[in-house]
């Protein structure tokens, strides 16, 4: 009987996410939970902790499967499999699930009549869709992608994709591609939120507070409407489906983060990718996608290189490697503010970054600190 563990945690809680989002925003850069500078710092805080969990698993449950939801899911899963050597790990995300719940309705079909093929990495993947006769339905989906209910998670501002671009690649991008394909529009919206009502993290902290108050009611029998404001829809569906497939050897088609093994030809076999896979008692068997178009191949290789640098920095505390990851990330502007954002985030998160201790002490000695009032208040109160 297989043993299965799930992980979903946030080192530093939402106060850490607030810093991740506010400090880059102060310098005109996108602050986002799993993308850009904020996403990299979430990885810096999280990867050492998942390593500690793996050490506990070696002692307590050495044959267990780890089903990881913890963001950034792809990088955490890669650290677990490649660097901590725990091969029985699958990374999950709700973004493909949300898309596959919404898109069949746009095509007037049931999900059972469609064949999905995903390729990419977590929060940076594309997909194609075929009907039961092998007809490519991707162009039809592209025409509907900007409609409400088109499969974009609730936490992503729905700036309109340029349809000509998507028809040229003939693939459907995930909602997070908006941060890359329409960077300026997404940045302007983020700055507007930053100035008016606080960052997404601050909004979610208020929602979390409201939910905890609601959950005090032992007579609660219905789903609170506040849950709809969060971006975690269908996580439970994905989790139960994956666990069922492993436990009962069901051979279910899912989109997961797993070892590439040739599924995407332009990436190394041991890279962790987010692809269509068959899940069974032996884990995830990735399904071949083949060659990506030239432009998307370039994007993907750059983003994978950025992830690898981020993971190495998280494991070693190498400041130069962290800066290299920053320079590679398209959402981090390469100008005089690049190192300012990196340095201020390091100091702001010192409590959760022991691997960077020496560099942080050096930065503090130079007087580096955030001037953002919300961040300063959090730090004054020990957060």
Range-by-range predicted roles:
Residues 2-9:
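N-terminal Rossmann-like NAD(P) cofactor-binding module of classical short-chain dehydrogenase/reductase
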Residues 12:
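Active-site beta-alpha loop architecture of Rossmann-like, nucleotide-cofactor-dependent enzymes
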Residues 42-49, 95, 234, 302:
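Soluble or luminal CAZymes and related metallo-dependent hydrolases
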Residues 105-383:
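Long, compositionally biased stretches enriched for glycine and/or charged residues
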Residues 15-83:
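Rossmann-fold NAD(P)-binding glycine/threonine-rich loop
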Residues 5, 66, 283:
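Receiver (REC) domain switch-region micro-motif
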Residues 1-2, 63:
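Local beta-strand N-terminus motif with an aromatic residue
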Residues 65-133:
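Rossmann-fold dinucleotide-binding core
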């Amino acid at each position: 009987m297989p043993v299965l563990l799930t992980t979903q945690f946030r080192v530093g809680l939402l106060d850490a996410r607030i810093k991740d989002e506010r400090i880059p925003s102060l310098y005109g850069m996108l602050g986002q939970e799993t993308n850009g500078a904020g996403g990299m710092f979430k990885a810096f805080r999280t990867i050492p902790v998942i390593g500690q969990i793996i050490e506990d698993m070696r002692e307590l449950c050495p044959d267990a499967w780890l089903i990881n939801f913890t963001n950034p899911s792809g990088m955490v899963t890669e650290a677990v499999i490649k660097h901590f050597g725990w091969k029985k790990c699958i990374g999950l995300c709700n973004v493909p699930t949300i898309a596959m719940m919404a898109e069949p309705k746009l095509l007037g079909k049931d999900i059972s009549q469609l064949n999905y093929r995903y390729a990419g990495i977590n929060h940076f993947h594309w997909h194609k869709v075929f009907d039961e006769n092998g007809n490519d339905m991707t162009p039809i989906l592209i025409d509907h992608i900007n409609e409400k209910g088109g499969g974009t998670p609730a936490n992503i501002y729905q700036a309109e994709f340029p349809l000509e671009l998507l028809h040229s690649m003939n693939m459907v991008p995930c909602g997070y591609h908006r941060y890359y394909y329409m960077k300026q529009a997404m940045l302007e919206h983020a700055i507007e939120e930053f100035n008016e009502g606080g960052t997404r993290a601050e909004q979610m902290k208020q929602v979390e507070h409201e939910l905890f108050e609601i959950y005090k009611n032992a007579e609660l029998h219905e789903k609170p409407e506040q849950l709809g404001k969060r971006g975690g829809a269908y996580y439970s569906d994905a989790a139960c489906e994956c666990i069922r497939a492993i436990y009962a050897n069901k051979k279910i088609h899912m989109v997961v983060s797993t070892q590439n093994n040739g599924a995407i030809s332009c990436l190394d076999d041991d890279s962790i990718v987010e692809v269509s896979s068959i899940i069974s008692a032996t884990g995830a068997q990735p399904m071949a996608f083949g060659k990506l178009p030239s432009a998307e191949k370039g994007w993907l290789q750059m983003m994978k290189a950025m992830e690898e640098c981020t993971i190495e920095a998280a494991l070693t505390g190498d400041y130069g490697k962290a800066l290299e990851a920053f320079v590679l990330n398209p959402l981090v502007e390469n100008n005089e503010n690049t190192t300012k954002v990196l340095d201020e985030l390091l100091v702001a998160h010192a409590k959760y970054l022991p691997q960077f201790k020496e560099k942080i002490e050096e930065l503090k000695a130079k007087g580096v600190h955030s001037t953002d009032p919300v961040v300063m208040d959090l730090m004054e109160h020990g957060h």
